[in-house]
Structures are given as C-alpha cells and as structure tokens.
Amino acid sequence: GCFALVPLEEAAAPLVKLIRSFRPHVLTTYDENGGYPHPDHIKCHEISMFAFEAAADPDQFPELGEPWQVQKVYYHHGWSYERIVAIDAAMTRHGLESPYKERLANWQVDPAHDQRVTTRVPCSEFFEVRDQALLAHATQIDPDGFWFAVPREVQAEAWPTEDYELVKSMVQTSVPEDDLFAGRR
C-alpha cells in the first residue's frame, strides 16, 4: 500500500490513541507542503492536524481513551533558504566543498515562507542524537548524502537551532520563541 492513500480517519486513529494515552502538551509535524511536496509528508501533516482536533473531541473515537487537548502545534521548518545559505557559507569559510551549491543556484526563494518561522530552538548539542535518529531510517536516509556531508561542528556554528512555526496554541505565549514549551513552563 501507499501511506499517502490511506483514508484520513483510518490513518489518524493510532495517533489519536497515542495522544490520548501519552498526553503530550506539544505536537510537531510537517507543514501543509510536507516540508517539500512529498506525498507521505503531506499525509503526515493531514493526520497530525486531524488527530490534534479529534483527540480533544469526546465524540470522536470514544473507544480510544479519554479526550486530551494538545496545547501547542508546530510545523517544523528545516529547509529554509536562510539556513542553507548560512551552512553553505560556513562550509566555504572552513575550506570545505558545500553540498548545497547546486541547490542554492536553483532555489526558488520564497521570503514569505521563510518568514513563517516563529520559534528557533537552540539544540546543537543534540545534533548527534538527531543524526543517529535519521540514520536509523536506513531505507530513507543516505549516510553518504548531502545532509551528512556537512560536519556537525559546521552546522552548529552556522545554524545551531531547529526552526518551527507555531500554528496552534491553547496557552498564552508570544513570538518569537526559543522553547516549544513556552507558555507551559
């Protein structure tokens, strides 16, 4: 089968159950374009947004546990033009070949999209853990690919954050933020 073709309610039910049992305060997902137009990532976005609403609604999926209201939803924005330019420049400064030259030459700059980021979470000390998690998806991630061609210390110098867009909040907060739990702490 194809994940992108699974009916929405069927695909969302396991996430509704997980939200109700785990009871998270924050949910992160892809934006409406899936980070880039990838059908499975777009489906992940649709499922996440549906499950966010359904998990809080006692009339939806009552067999999946007590309702739970996630308090904040963020879209992850990992591929901004600004970020890639900064990493490319850092590679050049370090005398390294940037894997992004061709991508940048063909990039369709969309300033409105890059301006959507509301939250930059400093997390460079966890880049190794992030990379190990990515590499665990052996069929999806090329360990010799462009992302892993950039040394972690260069990434940490050029762009030490993961970037998000706050799209739903049930708690008082103000942007910009540097913590996904702002308003909760």
Predicted regions and their residues:
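A charged helix-plus-loop insertion that forms the helical arch/lid used to bind
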Residues: G1-C2
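Metal-dependent de-N-acetylase/amidase catalytic core
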Residues: L5-R185
